[in-house]
Each structure stands twice: as C-alpha cells, then as structure tokens.
Amino acid sequence: CRHFVDRDMHKMTGLGMEYRIDSSELLAARGFCQHWTESATCNTGDSFLTELTDIEGDVVDMEAYAQAFVCRAKEIPFISVKYVSDVIGQNSVKHWEDRLEDARAGLSHFFNVLKESI
C-alpha cells in the first residue's frame, strides 16, 4: 500500500484534520518501487471491524496510517506490505490463527523475490 486513510480522522475533517496520506511522491523522489504497478489503499482505524461497512480502501489494519504519518514527517519513504489473514465478518480470530504460517511463508517469498530484483 502507498495510500493510507484513517477512518477515525475522517470523522474530523470539518475541523481541518487530514485523513489521507499518499506516500507515492516521496517513494518516487528516492527512486523506490518504480517498477511496482499496483497501488493499494490501506484503511486504518482504532476499532476492530466485525462487519462490512462502506469503507475506503483495499485492506484494513490498525497501524499503517500512523506509520505513514511519522515517516512522512521525517521524510522517510514508506510502503506497507500486507498479507490478508482474515475476512471482515467471519471468525477473524480463528482465521488469523490458522493463517499465521501462510502469512509467514507468503511474506518471506515476497521479500526474497524483492531482494533478488534489487
């Protein structure tokens, strides 16, 4: 993900609060991820979603917006690589536990392929 939305901050846009971050410009300025064609959006919030709602984004988590915010403030390029471990509305705790090994293997493969291309 290169785009980040904070669903909690979105509720405060009337107060001038920012709720979107696009890290593409800083990544491009540093020459990172130029060959990546996919561009996903991560929706972040402080609550655990248990049902599908009308949210902006491709994946949901609870931390990426804050990470992107700090990295942007420090001018550090940031990208978030996510492995979807559960589906909103299903038994997420059980799915998460079952998928940990799959996530570990999938992310390991992703970073090994990435390392070979650098």
List where the protein language model places each region.
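Glycine-rich phosphate- or other oxyanion-binding loops that anchor nucleotides, phosphorylated ligands
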Residues: 1-118
